[in-house]
């Protein structure tokens, strides 16, 4: 059975001080829970080092929201995988739709970042998703498999099995709209089937697939109960203690 993973993407929210308060609140609740899921928080880069210190010897791991695929060089403003490993990061989000839209990231860029992440022993959390126009035109599956084809070029089976893929319909990110559990399951199953066609049953059965897109406590249990959904990439709700904890509890419940 695949272990669910709940990851909180704080985006460009929070300071070192406010992030510390959040993590301490999470710790105070989670220390009394027997977890059957992985929990990751992805603060802004300036707050990562403090987050790592606060989560040491706890159930929470720390991720970054993006990275460059170069180790060093004249890339003003970028953060390298070496910098992330130095501060103690274990996970990194790659290819989020906001990075693709606002910063021009392509499937080729995502592919280079995945390779670099694995090279530096970082766990890549790779985002894919369709626009509202693509969904309404019936192109969802074709678009997402196209994204995966580019992102996974020359990635060996052993690494794919360790991937986390997050299905985030662009039309549901930060809009309050959420795919139904049936819609989310349909796409996550298609992702798993595509991995099976590219690799084999072992790789498809091992890869963890999250749903992201306005996940809240009120819809988490239904979504996480679907057979091909192995967790959630949580945005705004990960900045609210009770909301994020309730989503973690939902993951615990379905994996018990």
Name the predicted role of every residue range.
Residues 1-256:
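Active-site loop-to-helix "anion-binding N-cap" substructures in soluble metabolic enzymes
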């Amino acid at each position: 059975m695949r272990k669910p993973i709940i990851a909180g993407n704080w985006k460009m929210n929070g300071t070192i001080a406010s992030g510390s308060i959040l993590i301490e609140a999470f710790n105070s609740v989670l220390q009394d829970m027997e977890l059957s899921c992985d929990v990751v928080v992805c603060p802004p880069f300036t707050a990562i080092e403090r987050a790592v210190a606060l989560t040491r010897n706890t159930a929470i791991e720390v991720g970054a929201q993006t990275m460059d695929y170069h180790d060093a060089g004249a890339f003003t403003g970028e953060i390298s995988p070496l910098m992330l490993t130095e501060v103690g990061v274990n996970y990194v989000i790659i290819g989020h739709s906001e990075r693709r839209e606002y910063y021009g990231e392509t499937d080729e860029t995502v592919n280079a970042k995945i390779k670099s992440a694995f090279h530096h022993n970082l766990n890549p959390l790779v985002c894919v998703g369709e626009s509202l126009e693509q969904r309404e035109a019936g192109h969802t599956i074709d678009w997402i498999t196209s994204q995966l084809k580019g992102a996974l070029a020359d990635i060996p089976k052993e690494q794919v099995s360790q991937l986390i893929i997050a299905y985030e319909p662009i039309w549901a990110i930060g809009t309050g709209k959420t795919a139904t559990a049936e819609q989310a399951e349909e796409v996550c199953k298609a992702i798993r089937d595509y991995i099976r066609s590219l690799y084999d049953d072992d790789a498809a059965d091992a890869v963890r697939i999250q749903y992201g897109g306005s996940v809240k406590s009120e819809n988490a249990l239904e979504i996480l109960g679907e057979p091909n959904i192995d967790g959630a990439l949580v945005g705004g709700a990960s900045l609210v203690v009770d909301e994020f904890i309730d989503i973690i509890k939902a993951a615990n419940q379905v994996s018990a």
